[in-house]
A protein has these predicted regions:
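N-terminal "mature-domain start" segment
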Residues: 19-49
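Hydrophobic h-region of N-terminal signal peptides that target proteins for export
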Residues: 10-18
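Secretory pathway targeting signatures of secreted, lumenal, and periplasmic proteins
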Residues: 37-77
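Surface-exposed patches in mature extracellular/periplasmic domains of secreted proteins
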Residues: 42-44, 99-106
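Short, well-structured beta-strand
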Residues: 118-191
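Sec-dependent signal peptide recognition
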Residues: 2-8
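Short, hydrophobic/aromatic-rich segments at coil-to-beta transitions
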Residues: 110-117
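Mid-chain, structured segments of secreted extracytoplasmic proteins
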Residues: 66-103
Length: 192
């Protein structure tokens, strides 16, 4: 009986490990270099037949409580970057009605778009900010013989404590364009 229980537990562990397997759907590798740091692929998803998501964090961070996360999404199809972006902008506009912290700025250059936005997760009573998150998303049109669609490269910075949040607001006030410029300078990730 004890032996069966051990075998059962080992099989369950393997099952759950298989469920958490990270797949490099976009063939970008298990590392991504941004701002002179190497980020490790820690999560991926293929939630629809034409939609792929990959997330990278620094090796010493946890995906549940990261300081900076790199995300790369690809939506396959005959889509324009502006169409993909507009649904997020609509969501932000709707959320702003209940959350005054939410703010965004959009940038446009040729057929590329960037969205720099702040969101927060608040306590149930709305009196306390639990997580402050700043995101800079850059949308590219991909049109190669093998792939056609919209690629999103994003950087997500999070703050969890009052000190971290004050620092984030200070950066937004004094050095807001630093992160925007770093995201502008990246080359389009070469997905396969």
């Amino acid at each position: 009986m004890k032996r069966r229980l051990v075998l059962f537990l080992m099989l369950m562990v393997q099952f759950f490990m298989a469920q958490n397997k990270v797949e490099d759907y976009l063939h970008l590798g298990d590392k991504y270099r941004f701002d002179n740091k190497d980020y490790k692929l820690v999560w991926s998803s293929h939630p629809a037949s034409n939609f792929y998501k990959q997330e990278y964090i620094l090796p010493n961070e946890n995906v549940e409580k990261y300081k900076r996360l790199i995300l790369i999404d690809f939506i396959e199809g005959d889509l324009a970057p502006k169409d993909v972006l507009s649904s997020l902008v609509n969501n932000l506009e709707n959320s702003k009605k209940q959350n005054p912290i939410i703010n965004y700025q959009m940038y446009e250059r040729e057929d590329e778009y960037m969205l720099d936005f702040i969101i927060s997760k608040n306590s149930q009573d709305g009196k306390e900010v639990l997580i402050l998150e700043r995101n800079v998303y850059r949308y590219f049109r991909i049109n190669t013989p093998k792939r056609k669609g919209v690629l999103l490269f994003g950087v997500s910075d999070r703050a969890y404590t009052k000190k971290e949040m004050d620092n984030m607001f200070s950066v937004l006030k004094n050095k807001k364009l630093d992160l925007v410029n770093k995201v502008i300078q990246i080359e389009v990730p070469k997905i396969k």
